[in-house]
């Protein structure tokens, strides 16, 4: 059971990979949004032993290339409402706000909600065209 949390930003993302009980599979690292880097990320995640689920916040349109590339490579991907991540574990006294901390929080969310996660479905062309008109 490998939970991948991705904190999406414009042009790059922070990736953290955790297992239950806080075991760090891969220390947090940055990946760019170029096709080559996203394809390399997909291969790296697919090479990890065990079932892997990728979770990210759906933030504007920035998440779409990441989600689509990972989904098309055969990985389980889920884009969740950022409010769910914000509210998750929000009772901490320490308010750490870094990309690394956010990616790890998203990975912990994935582990705690493993059974309820539904796989990402990319938008069809018509829906995507309508969305981009806004």
Label each PLM-derived region with a short phrase.
Residues 1-134:
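Phosphate- and other anionic-substrate recognition elements at nucleic-acid/protein interfaces
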């Amino acid at each position: 059971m490998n939970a991948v949390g991705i904190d999406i930003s414009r042009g790059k993302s922070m990736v953290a990979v955790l297992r239950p009980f806080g075991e760090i599979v891969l220390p947090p690292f940055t990946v760019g949004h170029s096709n080559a880097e996203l394809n390399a990320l997909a291969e790296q995640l697919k090479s990890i032993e065990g079932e892997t689920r990728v979770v990210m916040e759906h933030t504007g349109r920035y998440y779409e290339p990441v989600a689509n590339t990972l989904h098309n490579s055969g990985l389980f991907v889920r884009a969740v409402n950022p409010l769910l991540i914000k509210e998750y574990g929000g009772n901490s006294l320490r308010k750490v706000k870094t990309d690394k901390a956010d990616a790890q929080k998203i990975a912990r969310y994935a582990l705690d909600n493993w059974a309820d996660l539904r796989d990402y479905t990319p938008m069809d062309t018509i829906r995507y065209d309508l969305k981009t008109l806004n």
